[in-house]
């Protein structure tokens, strides 16, 4: 590990010390709480949508969330380790077979829906 990677790892540890980032993947519906500063006031704004892309680049990791706002598609890119992110909550797991869901940009209505991923418990775990 070179010096730059080591410094980035230390910075990631420092930024995630007071918050936890849940594991999520493209296709998941997430609620991202963002700190918004308006003049002297600071408030938390919730942004809910489907993760259409995730970019894993260490400290520069980011993800794109897409939602439909009053009939218009809105996409927002978030830096994963940004201090402006208050929290991330996974609302629903999506079952997709692609890493980048850019094809959802051309879809609307029912064709833009994503199937929910169902998780089953194993018999050994259920017996205990």
From Swiss-Prot:
GO terms for molecular function: structural constituent of ribosome. This protein is located at the 30S-50S ribosomal subunit interface and may play a role in the structure and function of the aminoacyl-tRNA binding site. One of its GO terms (biological process) is translation. SUPFAM superfamilies: Translation proteins SH3-like domain. It comes from Ralstonia pickettii (strain 12J). InterPro entries: Ribosomal_bL19 (IPR001857), Ribosomal_bL19_CS (IPR018257), Ribosomal_bL19_sf (IPR038657), Translation_prot_SH3-like_sf (IPR008991). GO terms for cellular component: cytosolic large ribosomal subunit. Keywords: Ribonucleoprotein, Ribosomal protein. This is Large ribosomal subunit protein bL19. Belongs to the bacterial ribosomal protein bL19 family. Pfam families: Ribosomal_L19.
């Amino acid at each position: 590990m070179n010096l730059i990677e080591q410094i980035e790892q230390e910075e990631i540890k420092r930024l995630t010390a007071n918050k936890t980032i849940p594991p999520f993947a493209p296709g998941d519906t997430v609620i991202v709480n963002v700190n918004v500063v308006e003049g002297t006031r600071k408030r938390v704004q919730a942004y809910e949508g489907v993760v259409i892309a995730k970019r894993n680049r260490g400290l520069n990791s980011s993800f794109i969330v897409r939602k439909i706002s009053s009939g218009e598609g809105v996409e927002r890119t978030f830096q994963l380790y940004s201090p402006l992110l208050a929290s991330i909550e996974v609302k629903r797991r999506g079952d997709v077979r692609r890493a980048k869901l850019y094809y959802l940009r051309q879809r609307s209505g029912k064709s833009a829906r994503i199937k929910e991923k169902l998780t089953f418990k194993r018999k050994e775990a259920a017996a205990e």
